[in-house]
Each structure stands twice: as C-alpha cells, then as structure tokens.
C-alpha cells in the first residue's frame, strides 16, 4: 500500500475521529445507494475507499468494517470474481484485510473464502504477505 509506515496508528496522516465518523456515515449512504441502484461494484469501490487505518479508535474501525463485511456478505458467489477483477492492487490489499476480518467472525465463512480465493488468484501471494505483515489494520 502507498501509506508511510511512520504514520501508522499515529494519526499524523489520518483524520480526527469526528471526520472518520462523518466519512463512515457518508460511505454507508453511498454503499446503500449503489446497492439499491443495482450497482454492487460501485458499492464495493466506495466501501474500500479511504479505510480508517490511522485511527486507534476500535469503534470507528468496527463501524466501517460492519459496512464492508455486510456488503461482501451480500454478493452472490458468481459475482465475486468479476468484482475482484476490476480492483487495483491497493484495493485488493484493503479487501483482503476485510476478508480476514470477516473470516475471524466465523459468520458467512463460505462467501469470505470465495473472496479470499478470488483476491489471491488476482493479487497473488504478495497480497497475503502484505496484509499479514502490515501494521495498519481495518
């Protein structure tokens, strides 16, 4: 990812909690709007944009993760690969972080394994290595 490690969890490159909360509220509206319009790919792009990786506030990360994980869980199995194919490397890394977070919940595991398979297929093992070695969490 194109973030500087010195800024990890320090808030230096991040926003205030109030700004993150406003962004998350807007993200939720945009994701819902895209889904209601039958545009799950647009919803995915919005959901993966600007994750709150620089905040130490777990509630903010949880709130954003809920939006992303609910979206990922709503995809039909057959649409996952098509959606992953349109993502760039940074989006793949962010998506893989959410996939691991989703798998950790133990809910909807089959769909998260499908996402994992497709991200790995497109991004290669480097995606996994970057995600597990990176300090910034979602």
From Swiss-Prot:
Among the GO biological process terms of this entry, one is:
exocytosis
- MF (Gene Ontology): actin filament binding
Any one GO cellular component localisation term in the record: cytoplasm
For this UniProt record, the keywords arranged alphabetically read as follows: Actin-binding, Cell projection, Cytoplasm, Cytoskeleton
Q: Where in the cell is it found?
A: Cytoplasm, Cytoskeleton; Cytoplasm, Cytosol; Cytoplasm, Cell cortex; Cell projection, Pseudopodium
Principal cellular location given in the protein's record: cytoplasm
Which stretches does the entry tag as region Disordered? 1-21
Which residue stretches, if any, does this entry annotate as coiled coil? none
So which domain of life are we looking at? Answer: Eukaryota
Which segments cross the bilayer?
none
The record, for Pfam families, names: P16-Arc
Q: Does the keyword Cytoplasm apply?
A: yes
> What InterPro entries does the entry give?
ARPC5, ARPC5_sf
**Gene3D superfamilies cross-referenced by the UniProt entry:** Actin-related protein 2/3 complex subunit 5
> PANTHER family under this entry?
ARP2/3 COMPLEX 16 KD SUBUNIT P16-ARC
Its function, per the record, reads: Functions as a component of the Arp2/3 complex which is involved in regulation of actin polymerization and together with an activating nucleation-promoting factor (NPF) mediates the formation of branched actin networks. Seems to contact the pointed end of the daughter actin filament. The Arp2/3 complex is involved in organizing the actin system in cell motility and chemotaxis, in phagocytosis and macropinocytosis, at late steps of endosome processing, and in mitosis.
Q: How does it assemble?
A: Component of the Arp2/3 complex composed of arpB/Arp2, arpC/Arp3, arcA/p41-arc, arcB/p34-arc, arcC/p21-arc, arcD/p20-arc and arcE/p16-arc. Interacts with carmil (via the region between the LRR domain and COOH-terminal proline-rich domain); carmil is required for Arp2/3-dependent actin nucleation. Arp2/3 complex, MyoB, MyoC, and the alpha and beta subunits of capping protein all form a larger complex with carmil.
Family per similarity comment:
Belongs to the ARPC5 family.
Protein's name in the database? Actin-related protein 2/3 complex subunit 5
**UniProt source species:** Dictyostelium discoideum
What does the record give as the organism's lineage?
Eukaryota, Amoebozoa, Evosea, Eumycetozoa, Dictyostelia
